[in-house]
Amino acid sequence: MKTVQVNIVTPDGPVYQADVEMVSVRAESGELGILAGHVPMVAPLKIGAVRLKHSGSTELVAVSGGFVEVRPEQVTILAQAAETSDKVDVDRAKSAKQRAEEHLNHPNESDVRRAELALKRALNRLNVAGK
């Protein structure tokens, strides 16, 4: 099967680079499955897991929003933050989840949106880490 080169980059530098058979991302417009030869496009991403399929296995990378740029033989994901499943600090993600839930249980108008986003990021990281 043909492959597409994937690069996931954050402001801190590259997080993931490999040739894969398929990339799946959660764009603002919905789920996108990208194969080699895909039509060029750019789409904003939601907080979610990027699924990278190759050699019969699937790798997960947690991304906190950003953009995906698709070219026929290359996919570049520019994310505000990204972590591969083996790099997720599970204890830190659980603590962030707990703090966000506490803020949501005792809401202050200015904190609600921030707490919702923090909770989504923490749950995404835990999902990618398989916890």
Swiss-Prot record:
Its main location: membrane. It comes from the Bacteria. InterPro entries: ATP_F1_dsu/esu_C_sf, ATP_synth_F1_dsu/esu, ATP_synth_F1_dsu/esu_N, ATP_synth_F1_esu_C, ATPsynth_dsu/esu_N. The keyword Chloroplast does not apply. Belongs to the ATPase epsilon chain family. Produces ATP from ADP in the presence of a proton gradient across the membrane. F-type ATPases have 2 components, CF(1) - the catalytic core - and CF(0) - the membrane proton channel. CF(1) has five subunits: alpha(3), beta(3), gamma(1), delta(1), epsilon(1). CF(0) has three main subunits: a, b and c. This is ATP synthase epsilon chain. It comes from Bacillus pumilus (strain SAFR-032).
